[in-house]
């Protein structure tokens, strides 16, 4: 959570608006870090900034799928944050388009998903 917040804060001097996307990794870690994530992100975002999430990356195994990235989005909304959920990340650019401004930064964050690099390239191509 602190690294995500620091990444957002590092982008803020570059533009009037930061649109940050994060794909949580693992159901257990997401559940464990839920409150910390919500607290860190809500403190880092300015009123004009946005946080977007897609569903948790599942690497397989016997994980109990008892949390969703949308749960974190709802927690953030309760704190007054502009927070949005796009279940499938392939739908992200289409959903983001109306939110782009002349002076904004798009920050993509995630971990452990081997497809993230290709996803970032695809986002770049779609912009």
Residue ranges of predicted features:
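ATP-dependent carboxylate-amine ligase
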Residues: 1-127
């Amino acid at each position: 959570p602190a690294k995500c917040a620091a990444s957002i804060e590092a982008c803020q001097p570059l533009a009037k608006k930061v649109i940050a996307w994060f794909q949580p990794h693992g159901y257990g870690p997401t559940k464990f870090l839920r409150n910390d994530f919500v607290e860190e992100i809500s403190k880092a975002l300015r009123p004009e900034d946005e946080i977007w999430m897609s569903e948790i990356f599942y690497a397989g195994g016997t994980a109990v799928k008892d949390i969703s990235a949308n749960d974190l989005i709802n927690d953030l909304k309760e704190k007054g944050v502009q927070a949005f959920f796009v279940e499938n990340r392939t739908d992200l650019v289409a959903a983001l388009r109306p939110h782009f401004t002349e002076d904004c930064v798009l920050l993509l964050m995630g971990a452990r998903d081997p497809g993230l690099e290709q996803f970032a390239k695809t986002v770049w191509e779609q912009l």
